[in-house]
Curated annotation (Swiss-Prot):
<keyword id="KW-1133">Transmembrane helix</keyword>
<dbReference type="InterPro" id="IPR036062">
    <property type="entry name" value="PSI_PsaJ_sf"/>
</dbReference>
<keyword id="KW-0603">Photosystem I</keyword>
<dbReference type="GO" id="GO:0009522">
    <property type="term" value="C:photosystem I"/>
</dbReference>
<keyword id="KW-0812">Transmembrane</keyword>
<keyword id="KW-0602">Photosynthesis</keyword>
<keyword id="KW-0934">Plastid</keyword>
<dbReference type="GO" id="GO:0015979">
    <property type="term" value="P:photosynthesis"/>
</dbReference>
<dbReference type="Pfam" id="PF01701">
    <property type="entry name" value="PSI_PsaJ"/>
</dbReference>
<dbReference type="InterPro" id="IPR002615">
    <property type="entry name" value="PSI_PsaJ"/>
</dbReference>
<dbReference type="GO" id="GO:0009535">
    <property type="term" value="C:chloroplast thylakoid membrane"/>
</dbReference>
<comment type="similarity">
    <text>Belongs to the PsaJ family.</text>
</comment>
<keyword id="KW-0793">Thylakoid</keyword>
<keyword id="KW-0150">Chloroplast</keyword>
<keyword id="KW-0472">Membrane</keyword>
<feature type="transmembrane region" description="Helical">
    <location>
        <begin position="7"/>
        <end position="27"/>
    </location>
</feature>
<protein>
    <recommendedName>
        <fullName>Photosystem I reaction center subunit IX</fullName>
    </recommendedName>
</protein>
């Protein structure tokens, strides 16, 4: 039961960090390459 409580307290923190990093990365890509329907590095 203690492991479940630890998991339930760690998972929201990790997912918040992950989505924050992902959102920041997408914002920076859109700032560097505005209106890119396909990315110029392909």
């Amino acid at each position: 039961m203690q492991d479940l409580k630890t998991y339930l307290s760690v998972a929201p923190v990790l997912s918040t960090l992950w989505f924050g990093i992902l959102a920041g990365l997408l914002i920076e890509i859109n700032r560097l390459f505005p209106d890119a329907l396909l990315f110029p590095f392909f």
